[in-house]
């Protein structure tokens, strides 16, 4: 029997061989990544090392297929990260984004300083050192920028740039993860406690919706309608959903013409920054369970409905006219796990969960209006994903010309899609784009992307890996790369924990983002089921990517011209 087909499949250069090789690399890597060494497992990061081993034994991809797979995998990964963190990205940026970006800049510039010092101490050419630097911080666009700049300056290429990158990259990944573990050990950090702190901070977020039960005590609001009270409290975000008559203790749905009397009680939804003003203006707070606002004999019920009709995407809550048409009040809106005050001006997005209070008889009509179809929500919105990827590639390819630098700087195929994903997931509703993706679909997209990327990086680096280490001084290059990786991260990690009291979950994301390292983010995500690492990563990634590319070009320009 002719077995040539099997030989071609296993050792050829065709499409089937490439797909099979990537699949085997990923499967083996994920399986071996579950093994714990000293209680630590590398997870999907192990795919990289399986790729290096297979690449060393001659299992290679066709160069064009390799390049496509690697870039497409990276794009899928960063785009899904952007979609995940987008809804909460800008509030996070306002609260701690400046500090995180300054710390990330510190990592970048300490890495550059370490590289320059090693260049003068060891005598290794700067072109090689820039390759080692790019590998040590796992930054492929920086490598590409350095190679292009060197070629433009000299008219020839320098293979040691790529070799330096290849030998430093694997230990770079390990070093970034090691820095997280070392910081955790030094400060005796409990991941569970850090998660509790993060949950507590999110609960006290200025945008979070909180419920108050108030007794009307201010004479200024006696005999006033809720519409008149709203005018007096203009500029403050709140919703009064129900009132309790002080004489009969009967509970009613609040309307704009509802009149407040002394000792009436009101159920208010607001945010922490408005709590004091509203409480002091209306009266005094009393402790009442939410269930007391819906007594068993009442006709009022509370239901949660999911916005699933795409035609509602971008429409304001007030435009639904639920109170006017159906006598219903929306008290809270939950978006991506964040509770928000149900203001009439709030734009709705597919996937929002509305808490609606009103008559049980009218609930089916409201459900029909909003959608509330989990089946529809599970349908993937592929069009918006690929529109976003396309726009991201355009943005990433846009040359940014800076004074005094002959070569334009670009965000690259990773930075562009990340920025666009963040913007679309936050503002896509304004352009009628449904960007909602179920958490499971987003996770699938993210894991497929990162594993394909790691498999390709490993297979590409494996071919000359051992030769470089044994015959070309690669052992010392690995050591220098590890210093460039570890030293800046430990210094900034210490400053972040000791000086700025940065939450460890956010710190992991910031350290991964400051080195533009997807495997480290994957490790951080596996450490906790919180999205704080992804938010920290996305907060610093765009600026870091820009600086990594810029500094790689500047080092070549200043030292190799």
Swiss-Prot record:
<dbReference type="GO" id="GO:0005886">
    <property type="term" value="C:plasma membrane"/>
</dbReference>
<feature type="transmembrane region" description="Helical">
    <location>
        <begin position="504"/>
        <end position="523"/>
    </location>
</feature>
<dbReference type="InterPro" id="IPR036721">
    <property type="entry name" value="RCK_C_sf"/>
</dbReference>
<feature type="transmembrane region" description="Helical">
    <location>
        <begin position="161"/>
        <end position="183"/>
    </location>
</feature>
<keyword id="KW-0813">Transport</keyword>
<dbReference type="GO" id="GO:0006813">
    <property type="term" value="P:potassium ion transport"/>
</dbReference>
<feature type="transmembrane region" description="Helical">
    <location>
        <begin position="475"/>
        <end position="497"/>
    </location>
</feature>
<dbReference type="InterPro" id="IPR006037">
    <property type="entry name" value="RCK_C"/>
</dbReference>
<feature type="transmembrane region" description="Helical">
    <location>
        <begin position="74"/>
        <end position="93"/>
    </location>
</feature>
<comment type="similarity">
    <text>Belongs to the AAE transporter (TC 2.A.81) family.</text>
</comment>
<dbReference type="Pfam" id="PF02080">
    <property type="entry name" value="TrkA_C"/>
</dbReference>
<dbReference type="InterPro" id="IPR050144">
    <property type="entry name" value="AAE_transporter"/>
</dbReference>
<feature type="transmembrane region" description="Helical">
    <location>
        <begin position="443"/>
        <end position="465"/>
    </location>
</feature>
<protein>
    <recommendedName>
        <fullName>Uncharacterized transporter PG_1411</fullName>
    </recommendedName>
</protein>
<feature type="domain" description="RCK C-terminal 1">
    <location>
        <begin position="196"/>
        <end position="284"/>
    </location>
</feature>
<feature type="transmembrane region" description="Helical">
    <location>
        <begin position="37"/>
        <end position="59"/>
    </location>
</feature>
<keyword id="KW-1003">Cell membrane</keyword>
<feature type="transmembrane region" description="Helical">
    <location>
        <begin position="411"/>
        <end position="430"/>
    </location>
</feature>
<feature type="transmembrane region" description="Helical">
    <location>
        <begin position="10"/>
        <end position="32"/>
    </location>
</feature>
<keyword id="KW-1133">Transmembrane helix</keyword>
<feature type="transmembrane region" description="Helical">
    <location>
        <begin position="100"/>
        <end position="122"/>
    </location>
</feature>
<keyword id="KW-0677">Repeat</keyword>
<feature type="transmembrane region" description="Helical">
    <location>
        <begin position="538"/>
        <end position="560"/>
    </location>
</feature>
<keyword id="KW-0812">Transmembrane</keyword>
<keyword id="KW-0472">Membrane</keyword>
<dbReference type="GO" id="GO:0008324">
    <property type="term" value="F:monoatomic cation transmembrane transporter activity"/>
</dbReference>
<feature type="domain" description="RCK C-terminal 2">
    <location>
        <begin position="286"/>
        <end position="372"/>
    </location>
</feature>
<feature type="transmembrane region" description="Helical">
    <location>
        <begin position="384"/>
        <end position="406"/>
    </location>
</feature>
<dbReference type="InterPro" id="IPR006512">
    <property type="entry name" value="YidE_YbjL"/>
</dbReference>
<dbReference type="Pfam" id="PF06826">
    <property type="entry name" value="Asp-Al_Ex"/>
</dbReference>
